[in-house]
């Protein structure tokens, strides 16, 4: 990943492509994988690399991940709730309506890390797109892509329920997930795991996703990504 000047997120099934300028120095990369050193801590199951446009705990609503293009929200949602008061029934309602993305994707047009518009690919997909629009009408910050995560655990099975451990799910060769909302500043942090999306280098090499071999996103090059091994999940507080 570090040898490439940018990454492409491609879904050939729905003809979407987005460019991610992943080497910006104002990002922070978090790792929940690899050997656990003395005094360290990881979630179980481990196996996630994620990037945010800010350092852990330093919230700034103007910061952005440089993502531009069209992305397919096609896969399994996770709806995490933060510290503000909420009802479990409301959290479950959001999860259930977004769960149609398992079979009926929504296409998002993204400009500089912000979702400009949504396109339902079917009548069924409108359930998810309308739910998302309702969230944005209450808090427009849900349009910001706060996190891009890469699940690297190809040995685990996904839990078909609203469960945070699914973030580590790596399908066959790694799986991307898009993170919307950032607790505790928004009520919810929503992840959409999209195994169908390919992550490609600037030369077209498939780094993760699909049916190719999973490549280590941490390979070295002259330019390094700012990363740290996180004690907690940076996107949930």
Residue ranges of each PLM-predicted region?
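Active-site bordering "gate/hinge" segments
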Residues: 1-103, 109-111, 204-209, 213-237
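Pocket-edge structural micro-motifs
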Residues: 10, 73-75, 152, 180-182, ...
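Short, solvent-exposed amphipathic alpha-helical segments in soluble enzyme
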Residues: 26, 87-89, 125, 164-166, ...
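Short, solvent-exposed cationic patches
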Residues: 42, 130-158, 228-237
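Conserved mixed alpha/beta catalytic, RNA-binding, or beta-rich assembly cores of soluble enzyme
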Residues: 94, 99-103, 121-136
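Cysteine/selenocysteine-centered motifs that mediate thiol-based redox chemistry or coordinate metal-sulfur cofactors
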Residues: 140-197
């Amino acid at each position: 990943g570090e040898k490439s000047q940018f990454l492409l997120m491609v879904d050939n099934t729905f003809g979407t492509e987005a460019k991610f300028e992943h080497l910006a120095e104002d990002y922070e990369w978090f790792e929940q994988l690899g050997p656990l050193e003395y005094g360290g801590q990881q979630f179980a199951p481990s196996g996630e690399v994620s990037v945010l446009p800010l350092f852990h705990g330093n919230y700034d609503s103007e910061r952005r991940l440089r993502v531009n293009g069209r992305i397919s929200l096609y896969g399994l949602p996770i709806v995490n709730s933060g510290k503000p008061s909420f009802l479990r029934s409301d959290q479950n309602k959001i999860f259930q309506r977004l769960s149609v993305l398992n079979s009926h994707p929504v296409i998002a047009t993204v400009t500089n890390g912000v979702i400009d518009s949504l396109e339902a690919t079917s009548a069924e997909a409108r359930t998810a797109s309308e739910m998302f629009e309702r969230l944005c009408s209450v808090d427009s910050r849900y349009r910001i892509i706060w996190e891009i995560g890469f699940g690297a655990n190809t040995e685990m099975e996904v839990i078909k329920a609203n469960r945070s451990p699914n973030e580590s799910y790596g399908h066959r060769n790694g799986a991307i997930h898009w993170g919307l909302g950032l607790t505790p500043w928004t009520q919810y942090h929503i992840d959409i795991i999209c195994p169908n999306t390919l992550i490609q280098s600037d030369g077209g090499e498939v780094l993760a996703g699909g049916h190719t071999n999973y490549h280590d996103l941490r390979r070295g090059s002259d330019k390094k990504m700012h990363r740290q091994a996180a004690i907690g999940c940076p996107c949930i507080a």
